[in-house]
């Protein structure tokens, strides 16, 4: 008699995705981040649900309700700290997951890659609206600055901004709708993740060599389920350590001050995981140009599969492309640093140079290097 997990209508879907899934035997620890992102999403949804039970989306009580959660709710301080720092861990895993895809040429599975880029945009949007909810100074001014960017679009800009605000400034209507979006979007992300996984399992995973692995596959369980479990434990230990020992390490001190529309903080900056994009936005003096550069800094990922010129899939056997990949990583770190600095010399110039290098690497250097590597391989 056949095993129930292979015959039951629901169980066989789970079986095909997580138990008997044929997996390349040589995938490294860099392939752990997909499941870690799933863990992050579940953690954020659960902690967020418990926070939403005690939070009030009203400008007169939002800040106080967060203080109430931390002071009076059973383990409220822990739930909030895990939720706030969980976002940072989410983005660490996201950026590493995208970097792995870039390095090993996983972007050649175009549907999976494009859904992944959409997931990245959705997650960034969710994190942005979530940052507004505690209604501290940086929440309020961050919301004001970023939503105001939409006014750069010709003709419809001002109407668009007021439509998003629900009035003539960031006010109660804005907070209420941002809370609604912040509650809804994680479930949209969960749905899109299912599609991401479904599309991935049509082709199967890539592997570090970039070669076809049909000849050497193993079942996902027990080999990679335990490998993922080890990753889960490591990440949860890291997250709980940050949440318990230094919960405010990655936050902004300005957000401990209730929002005041009459006092602007000296340096308005987003959370650390948006600083690279913020630096690109600030490096262009023109408002519309800055907004387009900000959008394109993420959407450029969608062009990567089209700009792939090499005959080899990954960077494993391509030293020149490896150098450029690590140059891109270094450039993003420089942009992250610049995004947190004030708008003054020499930071403005460094930001402009780093932004130019960022786009030049994606659009010119990487495709050109791939083409040159092909030439070198044919050279005799």
UniProtKB/Swiss-Prot annotation:
Q: What else is known?
A: Heme 1 (or BL or b562) is low-potential and absorbs at about 562 nm, and heme 2 (or BH or b566) is high-potential and absorbs at about 566 nm.
> Any note on cofactor binding?
Binds 2 heme b groups non-covalently.
Q: Which residues bind heme b b566?
A: 97, 196
What lineage does UniProt assign to this protein's organism?
Eukaryota, Metazoa, Chordata, Craniata, Vertebrata
Q: Which residues cross the membrane?
A: 33-53, 77-98, 113-133, 178-198, 226-246, 288-308, 320-340, 347-367
PANTHER family in alphabetical order:
CYTOCHROME B (PTHR19271:SF16)
Q: How does it sit in the membrane?
A: Multi-pass membrane protein
- What's this protein's name? Cytochrome b
């Amino acid at each position: 008699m056949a095993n129930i997990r292979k015959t039951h209508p629901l169980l066989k879907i789970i079986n095909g995705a997580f138990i008997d899934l044929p997996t390349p035997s040589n995938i490294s620890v860099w392939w752990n981040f997909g499941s870690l992102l799933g863990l992050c999403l579940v953690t954020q949804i659960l902690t967020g649900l418990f926070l939403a039970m005690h939070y009030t989306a009203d400008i007169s009580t939002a800040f106080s309700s967060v203080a109430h959660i931390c002071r009076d709710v059973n383990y409220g301080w822990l739930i909030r700290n895990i939720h706030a720092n969980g976002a940072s861990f989410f983005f660490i895993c996201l950026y590493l997951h995208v970097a792995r895809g870039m390095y090993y040429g996983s972007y050649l599975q175009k549907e999976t890659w494009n859904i992944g880029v959409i997931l990245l945009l959705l997650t960034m949007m969710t994190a942005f609206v979530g940052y507004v909810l505690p209604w501290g100074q940086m929440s309020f001014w961050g919301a004001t600055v970023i939503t105001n960017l939409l006014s750069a679009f010709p003709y419809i800009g001002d109407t668009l901004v007021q439509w998003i605000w629900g009035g003539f400034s960031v006010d109660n209507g804005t907070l209420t709708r941002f809370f609604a979006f912040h509650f809804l979007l994680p479930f949209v992300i969960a749905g899109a993740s299912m599609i991401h996984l479904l599309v991935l399992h049509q082709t199967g995973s890539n592997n570090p060599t970039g070669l076809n692995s049909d000849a050497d596959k193993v079942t996902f369980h027990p080999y990679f389920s335990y490998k993922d479990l080890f990753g889960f434990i490591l990440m949860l230990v890291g997250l709980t350590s940050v949440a318990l020992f230094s919960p405010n390490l990655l936050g902004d001190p300005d957000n401990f001050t209730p929002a005041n529309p009459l006092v602007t903080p000296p340096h308005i900056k987003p959370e650390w995981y948006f600083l690279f994009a913020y630096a690109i936005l600030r490096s262009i003096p023109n408002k519309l140009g800055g907004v387009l550069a900000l959008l394109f800094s993420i959407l450029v990922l969608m062009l990567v599969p089209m700009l792939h010129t090499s005959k080899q899939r990954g960077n494993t056997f391509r030293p020149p492309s490896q150098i450029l990949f690590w140059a891109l990583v270094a450039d993003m770190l420089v942009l992250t640093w610049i995004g947190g600095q004030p708008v003054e010399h020499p930071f403005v110039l460094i930001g402009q140079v780093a932004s130019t290098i960022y786009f030049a690497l994606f659009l010119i250097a990487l495709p050109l290097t791939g083409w040159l590597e092909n030439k070198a391989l044919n050279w005799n």
